[in-house]
């Protein structure tokens, strides 16, 4: 299976870059998955969790909002704010706390935020 290149960038710099099997993005019309060979598109992203599947594991990045450009070979994400939640890292609990704060500040829609926070807590 061909791998998809992905980059997640915020105003402060790069949060994540790599080659992945797939990525699930929190689009404004709902979550959608991207594999290598996906149709080209540019879309708005809402507060949520980006799910990245690599060869060995799943990784997660919480964002408050942003844009995604999808081509057949890559996904470039420009987000206003993002927190990389890495499994097994020493600062995972701190990352989850920062992700919760980022999402709570992102939207006044309590129901949507609660749903995303529940997803983060299950990681």
UniProtKB/Swiss-Prot annotation:
The keyword Membrane applies. InterPro entries: ATP_synth_F1_dsu/esu, ATP_synth_F1_dsu/esu_N, ATPsynth_dsu/esu_N. The keyword Cell membrane applies. Its main location: membrane. Gene3D superfamilies: F0F1 ATP synthase delta/epsilon subunit, N-terminal. It is found in: Cell inner membrane. PANTHER family: ATP SYNTHASE DELTA/EPSILON CHAIN, ATP SYNTHASE EPSILON CHAIN, CHLOROPLASTIC. Produces ATP from ADP in the presence of a proton gradient across the membrane. This is ATP synthase epsilon chain. It comes from Helicobacter pylori (strain Shi470).
